[in-house]
Amino acid sequence: MFIESFKVESPNVKYTENEIHSVYDYETTEVVHEKTVNGTYQWIVKPKTVKYDFKTDIRVPKLGVMLVGLGGNNGSTLTAGVIANKEGISWATKDKVQQANYFGSLTQASSIRVGSFNGEEIYAPFKSLLPMVNPDDVVFGGWDISDMNLADAMARARVLDIDLQKQLRPYMENIVPLPGIFDPDFIAANQGSRANHVIKGTKKEQVDHIIKDMREFKEKNKVDKVVVLWTANTERYSNVVVGMNDTMENLMESVDRDEAEISPSTLYAIACVLEGIPFINGSPQNTFVPGLIDMAIRNNVLIGGDDFKSGQTKMKSVLVDFLVGAGIKPTSIVSYNHLGNNDGMNLSAPQTFRSKEISKSNVVDDMVASNGILFEPGEHPDHVVVIKYVPYVADSKRAMDEYTSEIFMGGKNTIVMHNTCEDSLLAAPIILDLVLLAELSTRIQFKSEGEGKFHSFHPVATILSYLTKAPLVPPGTPVINALSKQRAMLENIMRACVGLAPENNMIMEFK
């Protein structure tokens, strides 16, 4: 049975006019290596319970979202999709009359189990757990190195049906991105022809320009909060150098002296941290150099990333988790992609492809490390990623994977998968989820037993990891890539905010 909304009734939960307060018992285990009476050592697992207090501000703000790369395929597709939903637009395809929807969005189109009623499991919308911004109410803006208006950008992208594009054109033809930061050293040379709309000046002047843009956007649109997200070109990796970008002070001094190795994406992130605005990196480059992470932590400003997890990598994080969890040993993973959009064109340059290769290749590491029966220390499957640019297929990316595994008694198993990923139609709802969850997380505070004051989540937002290929985590924190674990973490934290136990799937009431 599906219900639209619910309210938790519990002595551990209190609803006020502006907040939800919950007291939550977090049950976990501590593992220690202890010496026994006979002098040997053994592993001891100790269950423990930690009491947490959560409070969530339920006053939903008017949200502004600024996209870096607003005129790209992702930016134009997302903006078009939100307008279509807000205006209730329908359009004719060769199959049917299609209604606008938010399919592909975790927050808007997925459900959670809340319990059982008369022997039947009860489900509710994911977004019913906590008050979230309605995507129809989001105000979009942003930057692009091309001055093309969003109606023409939508047509150039060739993502949406023509009938829909015609209906959306009046809403989008007057939306023109602000000029963006352009540095040809960080992206493919073939992007130069688009760059007719750029911010001039030194890196310090560019940061100041972005800050001015954000302030004016917030004032003009009368929004309460702004979230900035990078959905522009993949950059090459920045060199991390002691004395240049390893600390907040060194990074800011490097900006002041116009250091060439500070990338455009890092400049946007610096501007956001200085303004207290959450910044999310949707591409695979190392935007968050150590100095930027240091800066975000010290200023307590949310940062999240890296790289949208939309198609092939999402499947990989599910399939490898299944194989390793089933006691099957993946020994070779070969992933081939070809695509024809501007992302593919930019990735045809070796230096930008390397950024993508790293983010796509590391996705299986934690799953391999979890099973010492299958894998010796340091052992890892052969893992190859190939991306080629084929203009004809446009935004309809093809992903082909071959998984070879060892099975019982020396046998071999091979799984071959073909995945046609409509790149921007998969990425757009992920962008939406990232900005909505980033905003929500800024309204949640908590404290553990013994802590005197409530505080926010760590500025490095692991809560967003379900949506990213290479999750950014605080120093010393394990990286989790298995998709089911990432979703469970996000859902269970939100459940804790309303005093609900984690969904453990034991269903003891029916045993």
Curated annotation (Swiss-Prot):
One of its GO terms (biological process) is myo-inositol hexakisphosphate biosynthetic process. Its cofactor is NAD(+). Its main location: cytoplasm. NAD(+) binds at residues 71-74, 144, 181, 191, 194, 231-234, 282-283, 307, 310, 341-343, 356, 394-395, 423-424. It is found in: Cytoplasm, Cytosol; Nucleus. GO terms for cellular component: cytoplasm; cytosol; nucleus. GO terms for molecular function: inositol-3-phosphate synthase activity. It catalyses: D-glucose 6-phosphate = 1D-myo-inositol 3-phosphate. Its EC number is 5.5.1.4. Key enzyme in myo-inositol biosynthesis pathway that catalyzes the conversion of glucose 6-phosphate to 1-myo-inositol 1-phosphate in a NAD-dependent manner. Catalyzes the majority of myo-inositol synthesis required for plant growth and development. Acts as a repressor of programmed cell death and protects plant cells against cell death under high light intensity or long days. Controls its own transcription by inhibiting ATXR6 activity. Reduces the deposition of inhibitory histone marks on its own promoter. Homotrimer or homotetramer. Interacts with ATXR5 and ATXR6. This is Inositol-3-phosphate synthase isozyme 1.
